[in-house]
Regions:
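Flexible glycine/acidic-rich beta-alpha junction loops that bind and position SAM and/or redox cofactors
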Residues: 213-222
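Generic, ordered loop/turn and secondary-structure boundary motif
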Residues: 1-3, 152, 222
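Low-complexity, highly charged intrinsically disordered N-terminal segments
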Residues: 1-29, 37
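Active-site-proximal beta-alpha core segment in soluble small-molecule metabolic enzymes
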Residues: 33-214
Length: 222
C-alpha cells in the first residue's frame, strides 16, 4: 500500500482555510480545532505526519490510546492535547480512557453514543471529573450505504437526558455536542437540514449547561 504523506498536510490546510474564511466572514469569536481521526489511518508514520501540522486527535478504540501513550512517551505530544474519544466503548476502551484522565491528560472528551454508554462509564468513572460529549442521532438518508443513525441520542431526548443523568453529577462535565453524517461534509439540502437541527439543539442545550462550549463536526470532505 502506498501513502502519499504530503497529501495529509494538504487536506489539513484545506480544512483550516475553509473554516478560517468562514470565521473571518461571520466575525465568529470562537476557535477552530482540527482533530485527526486515527481510524482513518492509524499507521504510526501517518499519525506522525499529521502531528507535524499541529493537530489534535480523535480515537475510536483502546488500541488508539496505546498509540497516544507511545507518542507521549516519545515526547511527540503532551498532556494538553485535545483527545476526543469516539466509537463503541468496550470495557477495555473505557478503562484506558480513565487511565488517560488519571495520568493528567486534561483535554480528553468522551463522546457518548447512547444513554447505555453512560451506565457503563459510571462503573469505572471514579470521583475525578471527566469531560464528556453527546452524539446527536440524525435522520439518515435512506440510500446511505452505512446506516449509522442508530448511533446517538435522539434530539428530543438529549436535554432531558442531560438534566436527569448528567447535570447534578460532580464527576461529569458536558463539554461537547457531536454531529456526524455518514455521507461526510457535502453541499446538499439533506446535510444542511440536519446541520441546522444540530445547531438549534446546541443553542437550547447551552441554555441548560454553562460548561458546553464545543461543537464537534464529524465527517470528511467528499
Amino acid at each position: 500500500r502506498f501513502i502519499y504523506l504530503p497529501k495529509i498536510g494538504e487536506q489539513i490546510k484545506k480544512a483550516r482555510n475553509l473554516f478560517n474564511k468562514a470565521i473571518k466572514y461571520y466575525n465568529y469569536k470562537g476557535s477552530y480545532q482540527y482533530c485527526y481521526c486515527t481510524k482513518c489511518n492509524h499507521f504510526y508514520h501517518v499519525i506522525n505526519e499529521a502531528l507535524k501540522h499541529n493537530v489534535n486527535l480523535e480515537t475510536s478504540s483502546s488500541f488508539d490510546i496505546d498509540l497516544i501513550l507511545k507518542l507521549y512517551q516519545e515526547k511527540k505530544i503532551d498532556k494538553s492535547l485535545i483527545v476526543i474519544h469516539n466509537g463503541y466503548k468496550t470495557e477495555d476502551y473505557l478503562q484506558k480512557i480513565i487511565l488517560l484522565r488519571d495520568l493528567g491528560f486534561k483535554n480528553t472528551i468522551t463522546i457518548l453514543d447512547s444513554t447505555d454508554e453512560l451506565n457503563r462509564l459510571e462503573k469505572v468513572l471514579g470521583r475525578k471529573k471527566l469531560q464528556i460529549g453527546l452524539r446527536m442521532a440524525i435522520d439518515e438518508e435512506s440510500q446511505s450505504a452505512y446506516y449509522t443513525s442508530r448511533l446517538g441520542i435522539r434530539p428530543n431526548e438529549i436535554i432531558h437526558f442531560f438534566n436527569k443523568r448528567i447535570k447534578s453529577k460532580k464527576n461529569l462535565e458536558l463539554k461537547m455536542l457531536h454531529f456526524f453524517v455518514d455521507s461526510g461534509i457535502k453541499d446538499s439540502l439533506y446535510y444542511w437540514g440536519e446541520f441546522q437541527k444540530a445547531l438549534k439543539l446546541y443553542i437550547h442545550l447551552k441554555k441548560q449547561c454553562d460548561t458546553l462550549d464545543s461543537f464537534d463536526l464529524g465527517g470528511g470532505f467528499p
